[in-house]
Amino acid sequence: MARQIKRSGTTKQKKNIPVGVAHIQSTFNNTIISITSPTGEVIAWASAGSSGFKGARKGTPFAAQTAAENSARQAMEQGMRQIEVIISGPGSGREMAIKALQATGLEISLIRDITPVPHNGCRPPKRRRV
């Protein structure tokens, strides 16, 4: 007779971190939201792809909104109440991700844009001809 093996897997411990930082990386193809503690430890994350979108729909504002809601819900379960938002990238989901974070009940204390802008650096790729 086979014995049941008792599993002692690691469970996610509930932390109580009231203040955090939401990093939004918005590209043309996807939007990734990572919510961290002030020291930089990732508490929750979500992306348009992990929220169930595939292909070109990952780059839409609605996909960014869904990803932001998912990550905010995970962070609020860990006790988060107030966040600073750091945005990077030129994607279409930037504003909708911020609005979704506000709508979930998180208090936004600061919005900072750290999109890298070249001072005439590398030559950009050639224009698409469709």
Curated annotation (Swiss-Prot):
Localization of this protein: Plastid, Cyanelle
Domain of life, source organism: Eukaryota
GO molecular function: rRNA binding; structural constituent of ribosome
InterPro entries: Ribosomal_uS11, Ribosomal_uS11_bac-type, Ribosomal_uS11_CS, Ribosomal_uS11_sf
Annotated Pfam families: Ribosomal_S11
Keyword field: Cyanelle, Plastid, Ribonucleoprotein, Ribosomal protein, RNA-binding, rRNA-binding
Any single GO BP term: translation
Keyword Ribosomal protein set for record: yes
GO CC annotations, alphabetized: cyanelle; ribonucleoprotein complex; ribosome
Family: Belongs to the universal ribosomal protein uS11 family.
Entries under HAMAP family matching the protein: Ribosomal_uS11
Assembly, per entry: Part of the 30S ribosomal subunit.
PANTHER family: 40S RIBOSOMAL PROTEIN S14/30S RIBOSOMAL PROTEIN S11 (PTHR11759)
Name the UniProt record assigns to this protein: Small ribosomal subunit protein uS11c
Organism, as annotated: Cyanophora paradoxa
Lineage of source species: Eukaryota, Glaucocystophyceae, Cyanophoraceae, Cyanophora
Gene: rps11
